[in-house]
Amino acid sequence: FYEFAHLMTYDEVYDLLEKCFGDRMIAEYILENSRKLGEKFTFYSLERKQMIPKVEVKDYPKSWKWFSEGNCRYPLIRELCFSDNIQERYWINECLLGLKEKNLYKTEYLARIEIEADVIKYIGEKLDDCLFAYFNTFKHYIDLFWECGSIVGPGRGSATGFLSNYLLGITQLDPIRWNLPYWRFLNKERAELPDIDIDLAPSKRPAIFEAIRRERGPLGLVQVATFGTEGTKSAVLTACRGYRSDDYPDGIDVDVAQYMSSLIPQERGFLWDINDVIYGNEEKDRKPVTAFIREMKQYPGLLEIITSICGLVNKRGIHASGVILYGEDPFETASFMKAPNGDIITCYDLHKAEAAGDTKYDFLVTEVSDKIIKCFDMLHEDKVIQNDNLRDTYNKYIHPEVIDTNDPAIWEHLAAGDVLDVFQFSGGVGLAIAKKLKPKNPLEMTAANAMMRLMSEKGVESQQDRYARIQKQGIEVFDYEMRQRHMPEEIIEKMHNHCDTYYGCCAIQEQMMEILMDVAHFTLGEANNARKIVAKKQMSKIPELRKQVYDKMQNDIIADYVWEIAVRPQLGYAFSMNHSLPYSFVGIQTIYLAMHFNPIYWNTACLIVNSGATDEEAGGQTDYGKIAKAIGDITSSGIKVSLANINKSGFGFAPDVENNQILFGMKGMLNVGDDVITAIIENRPYSSIKDFYYKVKPSKQTMISLIKGGAFDEMEDRKFAMAWYIWETCEKKSRITLQNMPSLIKYGMLPEDTEERIM
C-alpha cells in the first residue's frame, strides 16, 4: 500500500495500468477517459463570508421620540432610529432605553453611542452584514442565561470597554466612569467580527445549551472541534513507543522514554522546538541540549522519527468555550462528527469553521459563578434574603454598581486573606500579592490582578516589587528615575500620565498600547499588532517589534526606556484593563458576600462547589477523593465541618448557622444512596436510632455507614448505637459451642464466677 501512497507521474500511472491489464490500448483508453473527466471538474471553494446569527427582536417603530425635532447633533443615532433594518432600530432603541433607565442620558454618553454606532456600521459594511445583529443576538442569549439559572459575570475581555454592551446588559461596568478604552474592542483599523467572552456557571451550561437547541433546533448550537498535535515532549514519547531496531527489537523502555522527554527545556510556559533542542538558537540565546543529543545517538533513526511527527495532528477534542450557532440549514456551512465523549462537534476547527462562514461565540465557565449561586440559594432557603429571581437578587446585592467599594472592610479582608476563595486571589501567589500591595480601591486591585501574572527576568526588579517600592516611597521616585535617564520633559509628562495610577508600572495591555501610540508614534493598528505579539507570546516576532520601536523613536535613550518600562514587563503574560477590572469586581463580590452575610453561607457554598457536589440531588456519581480534599482544604482554613446529622443533613453540605459550622452532606457518605437520603428526609424527625431504623428500614451497609459516620451521635454513643443495631438485627444464638468460647473470654462476656461453676 505505502509503495503507491504518493502522487504519481503520468508515466508511473501508465506503466502500472499496462502491467495490470497487459494491454497498452486499455491503459491509453483509461488515461484518456481520466483526462476527459478532469476537464469537466468545476472548481469550488468552501470559503465564504462569515454570517451573523440572527434572533427575532422587538420591532420598534421609526421614531425620533428620544430627541426634540430640531436636535441633529447625533446624525447616526437619528439614522438608526429611522432605519429600514429592524436589527438597527432595535439596537439603538435598547441603548437609548438603557441610558434612560440608568440615568445616564447625558451628552458624553450620547456622543459615545454615536461613535460606537459609527464603528459598528462601518465594520458591518466592510463585512457586508448587519453587525448590530451580533450584539442583539448576544443580548438575547444573556437574558436566556439568567433565565436558565446562571450568573453572568460583570465582563470578560475587551467587550467591557463598549458602552453599548453595558447598556444592553451584556457587560456590567460603565466604561466611561472607569475610563475603559472602547477602541480596544472594535475600531475601524481592524474591520473584523467582534469577540465577546461570557462567564457562566459550570453546572448550568448543559441546561443553557439545551435551551438554545430547543430554540434553534438540535444542531442550532454545536461546540467547536479542536485538534491536538504532537508537541516536542509527546513526539519523543510517541516515537519511543513505536521505535524498533535490530539492537532494540523490543523498543525503548518507558522509563528511558520519560527521561528523554524530561530533557526538553521549557521557557515562559513553552517547550523548546525540537530543532532548538538539537541545534540551538542564537536569536533566542538557546544552546543545544547535550544530554538529549547523547541519548539520541544511542538509538539510530529515532531523531528522524521525532522530527517527522512533531506538529502532526494526533487527537480531537472539544473547544473549552467556543460554540457556533446555526440557522435552519446547518449543513450549508458545516459538517459534524462526534467527540470522544459522544458529543456532536464540528468537523472543522475554529479557523476553518470561520473561513467556511460560521461565527463563534465564547461561553466560558468559572466555578465562582456556581459558588455565588449556591450562596444565594442557601440565603433564600434560610429566608435571610427575599426569594426573588436570580437576576434581581444579583442586581440587588452584588451588582458592581451597588457595592460600596469605599468600604475599608473590603480591602482589609483582601489584604488579610481571611475570606475563602476570593476570585483570582485565593492561591498562594494571589494571597501574597494582595498582602504585599494592599489594594484600597478597584483600580489598585486591578493592578494587583494583572501583576501577579507577570514574570520578571532573572536579576530584574519585578513589577510587584516596583509597584510596592514606589507606592511606599512616593511617585517622586518615578519622576527622579526618568530624569536620571535624561528623558525630555514632554516624555516625562506623558509617562506620568500613563503610569502614575500604577506607581510607575506598566502591567496593563492598554497602557502599553497607549504609550506606544503617544510616545513611540505607533498607529492604533500598529499598537494593537504589538499587543498581539506580546500577549500571544509570538517570541519569533519580538526582535522585529523591538526594531520597530527603536525606528519609530529615532532616539535610542528614549527607546531603551520605553522598551524597558512599557514592553519588556509584559512579555510574561499581561492582562487587559477591560478584562482585569471586571475580574477584580468578581473578587470584590466574593468578599462582600462573606462580610455582608454570615460567612458560614459563603464557606459552605465554596465547599459544595470545590467538592463537586453542585448537583447533589441529580443522582450523579460521588467523587469521595474530591470531597476529602475539599474538606481538608477548608478545615485547614479554620472552618469547622461537623459530622452528618440524621435530623439535619441533606444531600449536600449545609450551613449550620446556630453552631457556626458546616453540616456534612449524606451524599458524601459511602453506601448511602440517593433513594435512602430521600427517604431519610421525608420521614423526619427521628427521636432515637430505633425510631429511625423502623421508619426507613435501611440496608445493613447503609446503616453501618451512618453509624460510623456519626449521623446518630446526638442521640446515642456510637458504640452503643452499633451494639443496638447488631442486637436488633442479628439472629440470636440459642446455645454456644466450644468455638465461641475464645471470643467470649477475650471480650469478658462470661460471668465472673464461670470457673467456679465449671469446677
Enumerate the predicted regions with their spans.
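Alpha-helical scaffold/interaction cores of sigma-54-like transcription cofactors
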Residues: 1-759
